[in-house]
């Protein structure tokens, strides 16, 4: 069997296993298989997740992908991920530059990547957390990942800011340092989709998937239940209140846990449930914001206002 066929088989088996385990976030690492990084993998993984997991009420919110970049000398030549529609997948291109990860890289000449640490951060984070949160997600223990590199072996410190900006704009996840801070952090929590999408960050996908799971589990017991109508054929206030309360219960807990800012459940009383047998419930979510940049204007004045 050809190596690419083996990889495809492993991927299919992986996702069948993930479906069974109901994993919420996972990683796909192909670096040690000498499998070169390709954006086609991102699309294929996303299709598998959306088709076989999300569509069957088993949503996987985040798949981190890393593959071999040892032969890619200039990472800015990688495809801009804004051109993809793989909202459930993120591309990790970071790597350790001086610790154990570095020695594994030197010994194998294949990308080791920082996928494991990134997956750990996503798993530790609340669904609304961005893993770029400096105060919460230090990726280094003082030794490993203390010297950030890229998965082709290049040190982050050796690259111009314009190079880093290009990779950031292309929506890749990599390691970085801050002046005056000893930790190592990631640049952002991007997914492989255009930046204007509602699902362009890992935390957005995790938040809405948790809301979907919560509403599904709380409303499911009412499937097949009676829908009481007024004399004019509209839904009664009691019926609307009942289904609204079902949809709200887990969303209310998410607000308490600071995973949502607010939400609204809307049920039209005029929908024709007698003809369709279908009750439509609209749920609007107001997410938690993320301080992706902080601008401080500071200067001298002649007097304080």
Range-by-range predicted roles:
Residues 15-19, 158-164, 170-173, 249-255:
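Intrinsically disordered, low-complexity boundary segments flanking structured domains
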Residues 120-239, 282-305:
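Long, contiguous, structured domain-core segments that constitute the functional module of a protein
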Residues 23-25, 168, 258-260, 274-276:
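A generic structural signal for short, non-catalytic loop/turn and secondary-structure boundary residues
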Residues 4-6, 260, 265-305:
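Compositionally biased, low-complexity/repeat regions
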Residues 1-143:
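Extracellular Cys-Trp
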Residues 237-261:
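Short, hydrophobic/π-rich interface segment
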Residues 10, 41, 73, 203, ...:
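Catalytic cores of large soluble enzymes that bind and process phosphate-bearing ligands
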């Amino acid at each position: 069997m050809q190596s690419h066929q083996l990889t495809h088989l492993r991927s299919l088996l992986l996702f069948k296993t993930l479906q069974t385990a109901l994993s919420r976030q996972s990683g796909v690492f192909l670096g040690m298989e000498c499998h070169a990084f390709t954006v086609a993998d991102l699309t294929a993984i996303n299709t598998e997740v959306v088709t076989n997991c999300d569509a069957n009420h088993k949503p996987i919110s985040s798949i981190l992908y890393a593959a071999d970049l040892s032969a890619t000398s200039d990472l800015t030549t990688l495809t801009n991920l804004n051109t993809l529609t793989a909202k459930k997948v993120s591309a990790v291109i970071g790597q350790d530059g001086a610790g154990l990860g570095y020695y594994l890289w030197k010994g194998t000449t294949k990308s080791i990547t920082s996928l494991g640490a990134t997956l750990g951060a996503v798993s530790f984070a609340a669904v609304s957390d961005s893993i770029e949160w400096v105060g919460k997600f230090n990726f280094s223990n003082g030794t490993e990942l203390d010297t950030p590199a890229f998965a082709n072996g290049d040190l982050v410190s050796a690259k111009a800011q314009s190079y880093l900006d290009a990779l950031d704009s292309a929506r890749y996840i990599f390691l970085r340092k801050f002046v005056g801070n000893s930790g190592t952090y990631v640049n952002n929590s991007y997914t492989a989709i255009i930046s204007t999408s509602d699902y362009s960050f890992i935390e957005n996908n995790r938040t809405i998937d948790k809301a979907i799971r919560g509403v599904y589990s709380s409303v499911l017991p009412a499937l097949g239940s009676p829908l009481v109508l007024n004399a004019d054929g509209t839904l009664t206030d009691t019926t609307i209140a009942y289904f609204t309360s079902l949809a709200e219960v887990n969303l209310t807990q998410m607000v308490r846990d600071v995973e949502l800012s607010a939400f609204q459940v809307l049920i039209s009383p005029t929908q024709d449930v007698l003809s369709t047998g279908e009750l439509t419930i609209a749920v609007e979510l107001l997410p938690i914001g993320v301080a992706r940049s902080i601008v401080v204007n500071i200067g001298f004045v002649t007097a304080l206002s």
